[in-house]
Swiss-Prot record:
Name recorded for this polypeptide: 3-isopropylmalate dehydratase large subunit
Cofactor: [4Fe-4S] cluster
Organism expressing this protein natively: Shewanella sediminis (strain HAW-EB3)
Recorded family membership: Belongs to the aconitase/IPM isomerase family. LeuC type 1 subfamily.
Alphabetized Pfam families for the sequence: Aconitase
């Protein structure tokens, strides 16, 4: 029977499947951080249980850490409790921890792949909604709740219902300057923020195949923003080249065996998907969100939509509510929208390729008057590489702030947050009301678009001179 990539990985991980119960699947890698793990560790202690597979559990600190200082004294009281609790729990249960002083510390969905923890054909879970990022390697990766975190810790398994399958094909090749972020925002704009609900999405087509691993991670990272359980890209030579030699990747004879196994991780030609979506890559322009969810997106040469043009009453009301919150008027040219904050970072766009793209638009320029712009590398390794290439100097000379790794301004959980009324060009993944701070307004863009907005003081079409 022909199978999709998802079905192949799923079937190889089903431990037991009983009638009337969700199947029990095996988990290969469990990633944890300081925010969603304390209750799970406490549950193990109360029940007197050990960690089932500490060697398959990896911890880091990212959500509530400071990007200005690696000192515990820089943390808020609650953040310090979370960080110190994770330290204690990892020591007690024998979990490998990349703490704020470790050179490889970083955002969990950045450091996992770059250390080779993420591998094709594996099942990966984390108490974080953007775990789908790891699907870029042909892994089945998804976020779980705290009670599920405890279940995985105790059993290395999880009960899950099998999802439906969706193929999203991006045909042809994108124009110069169009990035993975533009591709995924265009996809969400087409199918909506709930278009993938109930599905595991496989991204394919020439435009996807042409992406680097960093780009594929950006696309899969935002699968959750279209409602999908997970996103996947079939592994290929680009995947293997990225993983070769990384710390936790197979070595020697095991590497050759892995390459052979990964070659089978592709959807069979006659496999049938439950749903299919097609986009033409050549139609994709630089994208940015105008509203309060990732599906409210438009091309840079487009206009803020007019709710009066919408016949669906529910959609019309949603547009009206969003426009009121973001303080934009229907018909406004997106290039006329000014910003006063810029955030380049997050598990969506904080890898070395992202910083290189942003630096191209910052080099030799200055951040516009009245604009505050920060660049937050996704990990210690990304920061080290960027500094070796001189990217930090480019940003600093242009007036950007260069920070330590962490989730930072993606969410208003740590000290990096917006004030009410701030309008931010952000490379993160969510633009919900208050996501970056109470009363703040977020526009999701690529790193290149964010850097260009920082120096112009407003959104610009990076395909043109500005």
């Amino acid at each position: 029977m022909a199978k999709t990539l998802y079905e192949k990985v799923w079937d190889s991980h089903v431990v037991v499947e009983n009638e009337g119960q969700a199947p029990l699947i095996y988990v290969d890698r469990h990633l944890v951080h300081e925010v969603t793990s304390p209750q799970a560790f406490s549950g193990l202690k109360v029940a007197g249980r050990k960690l089932r597979a500490p060697e398959k559990t990896f911890a880091t600190m990212d959500h509530n850490t400071s990007t200005k200082s690696a000192s515990l004294d820089a943390l808020s009281p609650m953040a310090r409790i979370q960080v110190e609790t994770l330290q204690d729990n990892c020591k007690e249960f024998g979990v490998r921890l990349y703490d704020i002083h470790h050179k490889n510390q970083g955002i969990v969905h950045v450091m996992g792949p770059e250390l080779g923890i993420t591998l094709p054909g594996t099942v990966i879970v984390c108490g974080d909604s953007h775990t789908a990022t790891h699907g870029a390697f042909g892994a089945l990766a998804f976020g779980i709740g705290t009670s599920e975190v405890e279940h995985v810790m105790a059993t290395q398994t999880l009960r899950q219902n099998k999802a439906k399958t969706m193929k999203i094909e991006v045909r042809g090749h994108v124009a110069a300057g169009i990035t993975a972020k533009d591709i995924v925002l265009a996809i969400i704009g087409k199918i909506g923020m709930d278009g993938g609900t109930g599905y595991v999405v496989e991204f394919c087509g020439e435009a996807i195949e042409a992406l680097s691993m960093e780009g594929r991670m950006t696309v899969c990272n935002m699968a959750i923003e279209m409602g999908a359980k997970a996103g996947m890209v079939a592994p290929d030579g680009i995947t293997a080249e990225y993983l070769k030699g990384r710390e936790f990747a197979p070595k020697g004879e095991s590497w050759e065996q892995a390459i052979a196994a990964w070659a089978e991780l592709k959807t069979d030609e006659d496999a049938i998907f439950d749903a299919s979506v097609v986009l033409e890559a050549s139609d994709i322009a630089p994208q940015l969100t105008w509203g309060t969810n990732p599906g409210q997106v438009v091309a840079i040469d487009g206009l803020v939509p007019n709710p009066e043009d919408e016949s669906n009453a529910t959609v019309k009301a949603s547009i009206e509510k969003a426009l009121e919150y973001v303080a934009l008027s229907a018909g406004t040219c997106m290039t006329d929208v000014s910003i006063n904050k810029v955030f380049i970072g997050s598990c969506t766009n904080s890898r070395i390729e992202d910083l290189r793209d942003a630096a191209l638009h910052a080099k030799g320029r200055k951040v516009a008057a009245g604009v505050t712009a920060i660049v937050v590398p996704g990990s210690g390794l990304v920061k080290e590489q960027a500094e070796a290439e001189g990217l930090d100097k480019i940003f600093l000379e242009a007036g950007f702030e260069w920070r330590l790794p962490g989730c930072s301004m993606c969410l208003a959980m740590n000290d990096d947050r917006l004030e009410a009324g701030d309008r931010c060009a952000s490379t993160s993944n969510r633009n919900f009301e208050g996501r970056q701070g109470r009363g703040s307004r977020t526009h999701l863009v690529s790193p290149a678009m964010a850097a260009a907005a920082a120096v112009a003081g407003h959104f610009v079409d990076i395909r043109k001179a500005y």
